[in-house]
């Protein structure tokens, strides 16, 4: 009799994806982040579902409903904070996952990489709309500032903004539609993640050396299931430490003040995971230019495969490219710091220099280093 996991139409798919999947024998802990992202997504959908049971998407009651969740609902506080800090863990894993892809040349799997970029945009949109829902000061003003960026679109900009708002300002209609989209998008993300995996399993995983590993594959289970479980344990420990000891560490104190359209906070800023893009946006004094730079800061990932000039796929044996990669990582941390600072000297100039360096490394220095390394190998 054939084993049911190999014959049953549905179980067979799970078997080929997570059990008998041939995986390279040398993939490191950097390959754990894919499964961690899946775990984060499941956690966010579950906690979000329970939060949504008690949340009301009305401007008069939204803030009170979040307070009610934290004070009156059984374990509401832990569900709410797991959802809020779960988003931070999601983005930490996302950035690590993308960084891994850039370092080891995983972007040469073009379909997988491009679906990943679409996933990144979708997750960012979902997180932004989720930040608006508690209807605190930073929720309201963050929504106003970010949606207003669309007014930079020539000719149709103003109409576009009012269409998204559902009125002439961020109000009840905006909050209701943001809640609707915030609820539906995680399911879209789940579908995209399935397509992402589908394309990945067409080619098989990359590995740290960047060379084909078809001659040396091992089954995913038990080797990588146990490895993923360890990663999951570490991430969950970090998340629960954050939730139970300092749940508001990554939040903004202004969001504990109910939204007031008549009172602007001294410094409007998004959540920490958007600060690098926000810093790039602010570094250009011209509105349309800033918006284009903001969009380009993410879409630039799509042209990374086209800028690959090295004869080697991975950066494992390319010290010059490694230096540039870690310089880029440091630059992104600098941009994140700058995004949270007020618009004044010396932060303005630091932000502008960091923004220039960001694009310079990806568009110019990385391709040049690849060419130099090719020549060094011939010596």
From Swiss-Prot:
Bilayer topology annotation: Multi-pass membrane protein
Residues annotated as binding heme b b562: 83, 182
A GO molecular function held by the record: metal ion binding
Subcellular location field: Mitochondrion inner membrane
Annotated CDD domains: cytochrome_b_C (cd00290), Cytochrome_b_N (cd00284)
Keyword Transmembrane attached: yes
One family name in Pfam for this protein: Cytochrom_B_C
Keywords: Electron transport, Heme, Iron, Membrane, Metal-binding, Mitochondrion, Mitochondrion inner membrane, Respiratory chain, Transmembrane, Transmembrane helix, Transport, Ubiquinone
Main subcellular localisation: mitochondrion
Membrane-spanning intervals of the chain: 33-53, 77-98, 113-133, 178-198, 226-246, 288-308, 320-340, 347-367
Annotated residues for binding of a ubiquinone: 201
GO cellular component entries: mitochondrial inner membrane; respiratory chain complex III
GO biological process: one example: mitochondrial electron transport, ubiquinol to cytochrome c
Ligand binding (heme b b566): 97, 196
Cofactors that this protein relies on: heme b
SUPFAM superfamilies linked: a domain/subunit of cytochrome bc1 complex (Ubiquinol-cytochrome c reductase), Transmembrane di-heme cytochromes
Additional note from the record: Heme 1 (or BL or b562) is low-potential and absorbs at about 562 nm, and heme 2 (or BH or b566) is high-potential and absorbs at about 566 nm.
Family annotation (PANTHER family): CYTOCHROME B (PTHR19271:SF16)
Entry's family note: Belongs to the cytochrome b family.
Function: Component of the ubiquinol-cytochrome c reductase complex (complex III or cytochrome b-c1 complex) that is part of the mitochondrial respiratory chain. The b-c1 complex mediates electron transfer from ubiquinol to cytochrome c. Contributes to the generation of a proton gradient across the mitochondrial membrane that is then used for ATP synthesis.
Subunit structure and binding partners: The cytochrome bc1 complex contains 11 subunits: 3 respiratory subunits (MT-CYB, CYC1 and UQCRFS1), 2 core proteins (UQCRC1 and UQCRC2) and 6 low-molecular weight proteins (UQCRH/QCR6, UQCRB/QCR7, UQCRQ/QCR8, UQCR10/QCR9, UQCR11/QCR10 and a cleavage product of UQCRFS1). This cytochrome bc1 complex then forms a dimer.
Protein name: Cytochrome b
Taxonomic lineage from the root: Eukaryota, Metazoa, Chordata, Craniata, Vertebrata
The gene coding this protein: MT-CYB
């Amino acid at each position: 009799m054939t084993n049911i996991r190999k014959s049953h139409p549905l179980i067979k798919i799970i078997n080929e994806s997570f059990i008998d999947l041939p995986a390279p024998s040398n993939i490191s802990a950097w390959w754990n982040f894919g499964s961690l992202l899946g775990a984060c997504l499941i956690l966010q959908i579950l906690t979000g579902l329970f939060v949504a049971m008690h949340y009301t998407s009305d401007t008069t009651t939204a803030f009170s409903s979040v307070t009610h969740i934290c004070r009156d609902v059984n374990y509401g506080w832990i569900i709410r904070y797991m959802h809020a800090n779960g988003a931070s863990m999601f983005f930490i894993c996302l950035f690590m996952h993308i960084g891994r892809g850039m370092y080891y040349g995983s972007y040469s799997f073009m379909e997988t990489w491009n679906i990943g970029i679409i996933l990144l945009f979708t997750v960012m949109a979902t997180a932004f709309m989720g930040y608006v829902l508690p209807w605190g000061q930073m929720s309201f003003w963050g929504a106003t500032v970010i949606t207003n960026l669309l007014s930079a679109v020539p000719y149709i900009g103003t109409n576009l903004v009012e269409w998204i708002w559902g009125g002439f300002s961020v109000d009840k209609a905006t909050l209701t539609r943001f809640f609707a989209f915030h609820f539906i998008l995680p399911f879209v993300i789940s579908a995209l993640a399935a397509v992402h995996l589908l394309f990945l399993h067409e080619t098989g995983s990359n590995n740290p050396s960047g060379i084909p590993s078809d001659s040396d594959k091992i089954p995913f289970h038990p080797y990588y299931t146990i490895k993923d479980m360890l990663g999951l344990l570490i991430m969950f420990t970090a998340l629960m430490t954050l939730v139970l000891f300092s749940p508001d560490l990554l939040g903004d104190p202004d969001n504990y003040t109910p939204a007031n359209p008549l009172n602007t906070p001294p410094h409007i800023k998004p959540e920490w995971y958007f600060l690098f893009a926000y810093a790039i946006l602010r570094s250009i004094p011209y509105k349309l230019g800033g918006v284009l730079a903001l969009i380009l800061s993410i879409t630039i990932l799509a042209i990374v495969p086209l800028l690959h000039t090295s004869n080697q796929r991975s950066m494992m044996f390319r010290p010059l490219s490694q230096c540039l990669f870690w310089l880029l990582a440091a630059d992104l941390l600098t941009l994140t710091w700058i995004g949270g600072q007020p618009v004044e000297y010396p932060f303005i100039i630091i932000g502008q220099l960091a923004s220039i360096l960001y694009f310079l490394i990806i568009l110019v220095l990385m391709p040049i280093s690849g060419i130099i390394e090719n020549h060094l190998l011939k010596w």
